[in-house]
Amino acid sequence: MRDIIDGFLRFQRDAYPARSQLFKSLATRQAPKALFIACSDSRVVPELLTQREPGELFVIRNAGNIVPGYGPQPGGVSASVEYAVAVLGVGDIVVCGHSDCGAMGAIASCACLDQLPAVAGWLHHAEAARAMNSAHEHASEAARLDALVRHNVIAQLANLRTHPCVARALEQGRLNLHGWVYDIESGRIDALDGASRRFVSLAEHPEVRAVGGEPGQAVA
């Protein structure tokens, strides 16, 4: 814990003064342009990946970058999505999976989660991804996991569309959905292209189209 406190002290001493005007402008309002939904994994840092400043991203993080489908008892993720879209008016939502995802690894390996009932219950929201992945052959366990990570991004994009605020914003043409997969070792990001319905290198195709139509029809 001491290193975390030391980090805060360095922030207060060095980083904050250098950006004091930015923080002053953010003291009473925020106007992020995008909602970024990522995994809780400590190796995935949305602001670092996108080189965004404070106030530019509205971020949701949880195990497996999961968005439960909208239901009669919406939870914290649903509330955060609704606030980002209906109140903050974000124009883009990114669902970002990543390599070596522990949540997806548990699904891919059919790990016993009897001792982790909350985790087991949470991962049921990725059942569609598991089903999609099981319908394909995989050359190795590593390939199975990589494909599952992509299928999960596709599944969570589909879940997003069940949220009334998202469906409404999409219909009105004021919201775009994006599916990304971040490779930790290489720094590469593959993005789901709305035109080809396949994942392509974001560095090689920065003009990649947002996801339209039915995300579930995409190819991992």
From Swiss-Prot:
The keyword Metal-binding applies. It catalyses: hydrogencarbonate + H(+) = CO2 + H2O. Its cofactor is Zn(2+). SUPFAM superfamilies: beta-carbonic anhydrase, cab. Zn(2+) binds at residues 39, 41, 98, 101. Keywords: Lyase, Metal-binding, Zinc. GO terms for biological process: carbon utilization; cyanate catabolic process. Pfam families: Pro_CA (PF00484). Its EC number is 4.2.1.1. InterPro entries: Beta_CA_cladeB, Carbonic_anhydrase, Carbonic_anhydrase_CS, Carbonic_anhydrase_sf. Binds 1 zinc ion per subunit. GO terms for molecular function: carbonate dehydratase activity; zinc ion binding. Belongs to the beta-class carbonic anhydrase family. This is Carbonic anhydrase.
